[in-house]
Regions:
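Short, Lys/Arg-rich, polar N-terminal cytosolic tail immediately upstream
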Residues: 1-11
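Alpha-helical hydrophobic membrane-insertion segments
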Residues: 14-18, 104, 175, 179-183, ...
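Hydrophobic alpha-helical segments, chiefly the membrane-spanning helices
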Residues: 18-23, 83, 87
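Small-residue-rich helix-interface/hinge motifs
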Residues: 20-79
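Transmembrane helix-loop junctions in multipass membrane proteins, especially transporters and channels
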Residues: 37, 41-49, 102, 106, ...
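Metalloprotease/metallohydrolase-associated module, dominated by Zn2+-dependent proteases
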Residues: 64-186, 208
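Membrane-interfacial entry segments at the cytosolic side of transmembrane helices
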Residues: 111-115, 190-203
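Juxtamembrane boundary at the C-terminal end of a transmembrane helix
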Residues: 210-222
Length: 222
């Protein structure tokens, strides 16, 4: 009888944490993009559109001027500080979201969805981390401007180009934040079933990302 109860409890744990992971993609991605969008909306940039995994506006001429280091021309299209703020607003929104999830776990209850969203929202730093690592240890790496012209594109890189703050410093802060909040959230995985909960949550996240990127997102915000 006890074995049946244990199996049932394990199954319930797996189901709860899988279900929590199912909301991770939309709730982990959209606040980040809305952060970008709201700042750009306040700036009044042309042709601004919010998409399910990004924000677009008529930025080609702005960045062409930046690549030429013609900042005076770029500033006539949009204020450099404003574009830098819009690029920083996404990560800042993510930090606020993660802190809100942590606060919810601590003061309300450790709902699996809160834990899943907090972890998923920070997964975006992976690409930036790879670039920052190469920037630190490869002296032959092109400049940030050249790297962006060659296709590198993430928030911290654009902020670095417009403000002069080094990419490794921005990414380093994000990694410290991830390590601190990630370690703190581990306490909310159920004791004795942490592996079951973690694996189920990750599977739910994967399903969430596939569904959001492939179906829900394009339908909601093409």
């Amino acid at each position: 009888m006890s074995e049946v109860a244990a199996a049932d409890s394990t199954g319930r744990t797996a189901l709860r944490w899988f279900a929590g992971g199912l909301v991770a993609a939309p709730l982990g991605i959209l606040p980040h993009e809305i952060g970008h969008f709201l700042v750009l909306l306040a700036l009044g940039v042309p042709d601004l559109t919010l998409h399910f995994v990004g924000v677009t506006w008529d930025l080609e001429e702005f960045w062409l001027a930046v690549w030429r280091e013609d900042y005076a021309t770029a500033a006539t299209i949009a204020p450099l500080w404003g574009v830098a703020l819009s690029d920083a607003a996404g990560p800042l929104a993510t930090y606020v979201l993660v802190l809100a999830c942590c606060y919810g776990c601590a003061t309300w209850r450790p709902h699996p969805a809160l834990v899943a969203v907090a972890y998923f929202a920070q997964a975006r730093i992976n690409v930036a981390t790879q670039y920052a690592w190469r920037r630190l240890f490869n002296s032959e790496l092109p400049s940030d401007l050249e790297a962006m012209a060659a296709g590198a594109n993430f928030d911290e890189l654009r902020v670095a180009i417009l403000t002069g703050v080094p990419v490794p410093l921005l990414v380093g802060f994000a990694l410290v934040f991830l390590a601190a909040t990630g370690a703190w959230l581990l306490r909310y995985l159920p004791r004795g079933r942490r592996i079951v909960a973690a694996v189920s949550m990750v599977v739910g996240m994967i399903v969430s990302l596939v569904a959001y990127a492939g179906y829900v997102g394009p339908w909601l915000l093409p």
